[in-house]
Amino acid sequence: MSEDIFDAIIVGAGLAGSVAALVLAREGAQVLVIERGNSAGAKNVTGGRLYAHSLEHIIPGFAESAPVERLITHEKLAFMTEKSAMTMDYCNGDETSPSQRSYSVLRSKFDAWLMEQAEEAGAQLITGIRVDNLVQRDGKVVGVEADGDVIEAKTVILADGVNSILAEKLGMAKRVKPTNVAVGVKELIELPKSVIEDRFQLQGNQGAACLFAGSPTDGLMGGGFLYTNENTLSLGLVCGLHHLHDAKKSVPQMLEDFKQHPAVAPLIAGGKLVEYSAHVVPEAGINMLPELVGDGVLIAGDAAGMCMNLGFTIRGMDLAIAAGEAAAKTVLSAMKSDDFSKQKLAEYRQHLESGPLRDMRMYQKLPAFLDNPRMFSGYPELAVGVARDLFTIDGSAPELMRKKILRHGKKVGFINLIKDGMKGVTVL
């Protein structure tokens, strides 16, 4: 194998890497994917929601054969204090097109399936091997060094996840700052399919996506999540790494307290813990974007910081898929002209501008807006406090609704309310 020269070597068999391999292999390119895990998806962790649009036009109708868990039709967004919660609930009963849908997924299953599609198209996969270094010649990346072997390629796509050491060694990415990432922990809790459907008011393959702000992260930047799978629940939380030194609790303790919350405990009661995982999550959006292109090399997916936390939606998988496709299209174009220079591979960024970078640029100020302690302490307390007063009748003299809202608003501060509101309008 060391004597072969591949058209592309892809480091990482996650979504970006697998899609890049699939698109390249379909066009007859010689592709090698190197994955350090024992299988595709073995080391990949996600909360669990895939927006279908970017994969739908690559594999139309993929959900009919892919191991998706449930079609998300129910959305819940909750503001939580230590013992209470105020929840907004949305149920989508309308018929949607395939590209408008989203699904809960388990990456170990889904990534393995996606890589199988790439292999069937002609891509080669090696697992259980770590790429130690990139091979350079005259300033151009010409291959990789893995397990003592040098494997050459016309181009290399780095899809090796957040905190890519290889990109850092090339000088294309800086060492990840604590302000740019979060720590995510997740439990997979097993329950009978019928119990999940009863508790979340689901029918058939319908699923629910629930996000929680406030007490899950002890008032620090981050939040909790819960996604329904076919016969498991994906439950976890994400907390900004740079805030953990201010935390009064450890992340595992935050998760335990989250599970005991009155709004969560009944949903997971009687469940069996079948898996625990942890992961570092890119949080700064376009503000942590590395140099995407070099001579003979491209960076895609989490390695490029392609993740967006909008508070009400969290995107990463669809961006990774779009980036993988863009990287593959760029390499195919380079193959036609036999030009793998940085200048030629710059087409990659042009492809991204019509998808991931467009979306990330629109919300580039949002990470700084969310990095505000009031978002995860003051405002959840405000929402819960107003809801409590609205629904509590104790026989005392009634109070106008506006007075109830104003009374709780004073705790946040009216200047802060105005300031945060104006900033939110400009950001969103």
Swiss-Prot record:
Keywords: Electron transport, FAD, Flavoprotein, Oxidoreductase, Transport. Pfam families: FAD_binding_3. GO terms for molecular function: FAD binding; oxidoreductase activity. Coiled coil: none annotated. Gene3D superfamilies: FAD/NAD(P)-binding domain. Its cofactor is FAD. PANTHER family: ELECTRON TRANSFER FLAVOPROTEIN-QUINONE OXIDOREDUCTASE YDIS-RELATED, PROTEIN FIXC. Belongs to the ETF-QO/FixC family. Could be part of an electron transfer system required for anaerobic carnitine reduction. This is Protein FixC. The lineage of its organism: Bacteria, Pseudomonadati, Pseudomonadota, Gammaproteobacteria, Enterobacterales.
